[in-house]
């Protein structure tokens, strides 16, 4: 508290961290610590900031970082519609993929590095984050913002065509019509990928895919809409568009080269398809 009895920025940040930990639905106590230690304002550029709500841009009254510790989008590049995502949604993403010390993570779409920093904190000690950003200006900002962090490689490039290293988790911050096969193939055994699946104008779901001994399990988690991922947003690759109910029913995803679509298919793409049958039934 300040001398006047008002909450200090440290108090506000600490309470925000508690809310983030609760939003993650995780029992990992490290999450609250990470959310408290990584300062959001260090990645947003100088204030005042533009808060995005219902497609409107609202400028904060001042450059007081307290305005950033809310569940709000913060504009990073208004001309391109690129924002720093809603903290509670990302907390849920992080809780779902459950980063562990020593793991290798790939982040696709870094923005300016805030969630990259959180991931790097959670895979420490001994872990590494490969942060891939297709926008050169954002990649440069990410690199500058993360200069004091260890275990991070910032790569300016197209993650849909680049060769990716083997990874324990892949954290995607752009919407895809279907995830590229290369992303699934980069997963180590028990590796996890969370990705915003924007299968149609009516469907935007965060899905969690896990590489198991039987194949790739998949499940829908929550609504999620992100800026489209360049290179993975072509609707023409789809030969069967899922219904809303079908998209929510997914239980596995198969590479077409390994198995042809069958009667359990709810969505079919050029290189992979989603099934409503458990992966162990394949």
Regions found by a protein language model. Give the residues of each.
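Generic marker of "main functional regions" within proteins
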Residues: 30, 36, 41, 45-48, ...
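SAM/dcSAM-binding transferase cores
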Residues: 2-14, 185, 197, 201-282
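Generic structural signal for short, solvent-exposed loop/turn connectors between secondary structure elements
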Residues: 77-80, 144-169, 239-260
